[in-house]
């Protein structure tokens, strides 16, 4: 059964009480005061908290979050970036790594041993992404995730461990 990471896109703390959501993703570009309030409330409820965005490592460290989801898909030196994150955040931090939707890149990023590998999914080309995720899960022990980049994406048909949705899309 898929687990959900819900990306918080608006100042809404009501999802913290949803027992089906175990992990939240805070955007480093969002208001820091809100991120701090949300993190405190989510921590009290026993939820995991990750950060994303350009300043994800800094936000993670500042607020004492559990880890980050970092986009390595555009990075020409992903190993150096990943090693920086591991050193900056510590060995116990959770790191989810977004990869390009290609087998070679998925294998390369997996060599760094992230906690989970994130594939990006759009409605256009969804079948190719489904096939890629299925192939990946057949070969690797690292958990896989899909990051829904569009609304109304049929994520239920993915053979993945984790689905990352925005708070607008999470309506289960």
Predicted regions and their residues:
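Conserved N-terminal beta1-alpha1 strand-loop-helix module at the mouth
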Residues: 1-69, 73-77, 88-101, 107-115, ...
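Charged helix-capping and loop-helix junction motifs
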Residues: 124-131
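A short, hydrophobic beta-strand element within the central beta-sheet of small alpha/beta folds
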Residues: 140-142
């Amino acid at each position: 059964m898929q687990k959900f990471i819900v990306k918080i896109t608006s100042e809404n703390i009501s999802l913290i009480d949803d027992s089906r959501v175990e992990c939240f993703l805070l955007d480093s570009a969002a208001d820091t005061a809100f991120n701090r309030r949300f993190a405190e409330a989510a921590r009290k409820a026993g939820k995991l908290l990750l950060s994303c965005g350009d300043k994800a490592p800094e936000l993670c460290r500042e607020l004492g979050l559990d880890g980050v989801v970092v986009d390595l898909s555009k990075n020409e030196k992903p190993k150096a970036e990943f090693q920086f994150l591991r050193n900056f955040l510590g060995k116990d931090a959770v790191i989810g790594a977004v990869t390009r939707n290609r087998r070679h890149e998925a294998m390369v990023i997996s060599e760094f041993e992230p906690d989970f590998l994130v594939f990006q999914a759009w409605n256009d080309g969804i079948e190719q992404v489904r096939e890629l995720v299925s192939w990946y899960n057949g070969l690797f022990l690292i958990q896989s995730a899909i990051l829904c980049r569009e609304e109304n994406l049929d994520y239920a048909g993915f053979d993945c461990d984790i689905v990352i949705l925005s708070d607008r899309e999470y309506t289960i």
